Amino acid sequence: DPSRTPGGSSGGSSAAVSAGMVPFCTASDGGGSIRTPAAFTGLVGLRASYGRIPTFGDTHLAQNAVVGSLTTTVADTALLLDVMAGPDPRD
């Protein structure tokens, strides 16, 4: 429906996950870029706490942004968090 938007800077990614084009996507959120698209497209959006998922080397992130994911199920979100999370002394 071209009259609607998937919202946020991760809107294209959330549209792809919602349409079944990809099983999940990673994203960053500093002002709703995970949460808004998840709400608009019926996905599970995780905006992890700062430091939960390392951000070292991700130079495009704003200082207040954190990494997270968009998936279709809570189980997929938990699996992805297990893969992505962990301490990084460079953060």
Indicate where each model-derived feature is located.
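Flexible, glycine/charged-enriched surface loops at secondary-structure junctions
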Residues: 90-91
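Short glycine/serine-rich loop segments
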Residues: 1-84
